[in-house]
Amino acid sequence: MKQVGLRIDVDTFRGTRDGVPRLLDLLGQHGIQASFFFSVGPDNMGRHLWRLVKPKFLWKMLRSRAASLYGWDILLAGTAWPGRRIGAGNEAVIRAAAESHEVGLHAWDHYSWQAWSGVWPQERLALEVERGLLELERIIGRPVTCSAVAGWRADQRVVKAKESFDFLYNSDCRGTRPFLPQLGSGTFGTVQIPVTLPTWDEAVGTAVDIAGFNRYLLDCIHRDPGVPVYTIHAEVEGIAYADQFNELLTMAAEEEIQFCPLSQLLPADFSELPSGKVVRGELAGREGWLGREQLLTSGV
């Protein structure tokens, strides 16, 4: 069996309320455990509409048919009215996920992190993480041991800002395999587990059409020479394309692919991991900068 980390990002109120329960049902039917990363503060995702002036973002929204994919309640959330508190309004759903799956922090305010983390001082970065962490721990009633920043907006500043939270791992960037981020003076930070595979919205309309996506993704998994990690979104695979995701899980099992929580991808001895840095870069199918893996050593 080829092991693939399954990361589920939950960005919005509706994704939490409607998408997560559907995903829990599907994963239960297939006997799969995954890593859920929750946004728990205000749902202000509609404020991303200003990015429509950017050609790359406009094209992404058009080719992914964003209005029918996400729904207008998501696309307008937090614009004409204050964003609803995601965690406080969906505590039972989040606790249900935590009963059977690994649960980590995605963001306090997904929109704000994606829009402003690149210029925030380190103290503000740490404050945002702490605010979300305290809320998520209050909801599930136990320590949170992992995190994955919104939109992969991470660099070495973010790596350092998160060091005080003693996470087992972070999944803040795109890359090929788990690595130890190098800090100053020869020390290393919390393990990073990068996402290696394209997401639905990155691939559909550019590399493949909707009908061919499952086959495309499975072929990417078979070709992945590193440690495969796949990200889905509760707003996509948990709502509009839940049936397609169900088919993907069936096809994956038939092809000897086993999805698992990200923590199961870590070796027993972290000294075996390569060292590296999280640097800013770009990725086909995604607008703006994001964190990319830059390996410095190959590991054991």
Curated annotation (Swiss-Prot):
Keywords annotated in UniProt: Antibiotic resistance, Hydrolase, Lipid A biosynthesis, Lipid biosynthesis, Lipid metabolism, Lipopolysaccharide biosynthesis
GO biological process terms held by the UniProt record: 4-amino-4-deoxy-alpha-L-arabinopyranosyl undecaprenyl phosphate biosynthetic process; lipid A biosynthetic process; lipopolysaccharide biosynthetic process; response to antibiotic
Keyword Protease attributed: no
Pathway: Glycolipid biosynthesis; 4-amino-4-deoxy-alpha-L-arabinose undecaprenyl phosphate biosynthesis; 4-amino-4-deoxy-alpha-L-arabinose undecaprenyl phosphate from UDP-4-deoxy-4-formamido-beta-L-arabinose and undecaprenyl phosphate: step 2/2; Bacterial outer membrane biogenesis; lipopolysaccharide biosynthesis
Annotated InterPro entries: ArnD, Glyco_hydro/deAcase_b/a-brl, NODB_dom, Polysacc_deacetylase_ArnD
Record field: catalytic activity: 4-deoxy-4-formamido-alpha-L-arabinopyranosyl di-trans,octa-cis-undecaprenyl phosphate + H2O = 4-amino-4-deoxy-alpha-L-arabinopyranosyl di-trans,octa-cis-undecaprenyl phosphate + formate
Top enzyme category: hydrolase
GO annotations of cellular component type: membrane
Pfam families per UniProt: Polysacc_deac_1
EC number: 3.5.1.n3
Transport keyword on record: no
GO MF annotation list: hydrolase activity, acting on carbon-nitrogen (but not peptide) bonds, in linear amides
Every NodB homology domain range: 2-260
Coiled-coil portions: none
Record-linked HAMAP family: ArnD
PANTHER family: 4-DEOXY-4-FORMAMIDO-L-ARABINOSE-PHOSPHOUNDECAPRENOL DEFORMYLASE ARND-RELATED (PTHR10587:SF137), GLYCOSYL TRANSFERASE-RELATED (PTHR10587)
Similarity comment: Belongs to the polysaccharide deacetylase family. ArnD deformylase subfamily.
Protein function: Catalyzes the deformylation of 4-deoxy-4-formamido-L-arabinose-phosphoundecaprenol to 4-amino-4-deoxy-L-arabinose-phosphoundecaprenol. The modified arabinose is attached to lipid A and is required for resistance to polymyxin and cationic antimicrobial peptides.
Protein name: Probable 4-deoxy-4-formamido-L-arabinose-phosphoundecaprenol deformylase ArnD
The organism of origin for this protein: Klebsiella pneumoniae (strain 342)
Organism placement in taxonomy: Bacteria, Pseudomonadati, Pseudomonadota, Gammaproteobacteria, Enterobacterales
Gene field: arnD
